[in-house]
Amino acid sequence: MASGTRCIGSFRGDGFEIFKFAKEATGFTRYRVLDLEQRAREQLAAQPIDAAVISFGANDAQAVFANGHLHPLMSDGWKQVIGDRIDGYVKALRSTGAVVYWIGLPVMRDPQLDAEMQAMDAFYEQHMRRLGVPFLDSRPLTLDAQGRYNAYLPDLKTGKPVLMRTGDGLHMIGVGYQRLTNAVASDLRRYAERARRESGRPVPAATPSGEAR
């Protein structure tokens, strides 16, 4: 499994192998710095995977230069270039038979940036639907009870406020990323159990809490 988010802790001890392919400060608008599709194909050639959990967007809130033209953020040209790059990236991930999940972006502290992220997420969700890729809308999971940004959010088990965000108002800390990926983690466990049964491999025994170990 490749992780583009920080959900690694959700799977420790569950019989999963985790390969972190993520690279900071990259995105679909930055192919002059790093071609994500090419990098993915190189990584997959060295390490095939069964599932990929990916999330992009925070670094792509900018214009994209392609084919001699500068396309403003969310313009038709931007959507065409980014859409084509997403197609190639997902195709590369699926080339090993991997299932792909896309996790949307959390709410941002800065209102203007948050509006841009919402517009981009709407584009990504529509694109993932066309590709048949499950899309997790993480925004509801990152709003407080008043529907606003808050660095502290209630723990899903205890209800007590827990620090989830870093000081920049953009990123999340480990427990915050795990909050976003719980639904995907559950789906991946079911997928892994089906795959193990079909291959004749034993399924890890369930713990008293019901989680596979």
Language model features with spans:
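Second-shell loop/turn segments in exported
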Residues: 25-30, 72-80, 89-90, 107-115, ...
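Stable alpha-helical elements in mature extracytoplasmic
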Residues: 3, 7, 32, 36, ...
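Structural recognition of the beta-strand scaffold that forms the well-ordered cores
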Residues: 17-22, 50-56, 99-104, 134-137, ...
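Active-site segments of SGNH/GDSL-like serine hydrolases
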Residues: 55-61, 65, 89-121, 140
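A short small-residue
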Residues: 66-70, 104, 161-165
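Conserved SGNH/GDSL esterase-like catalytic core that processes O-acyl groups on lipids
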Residues: 1-81
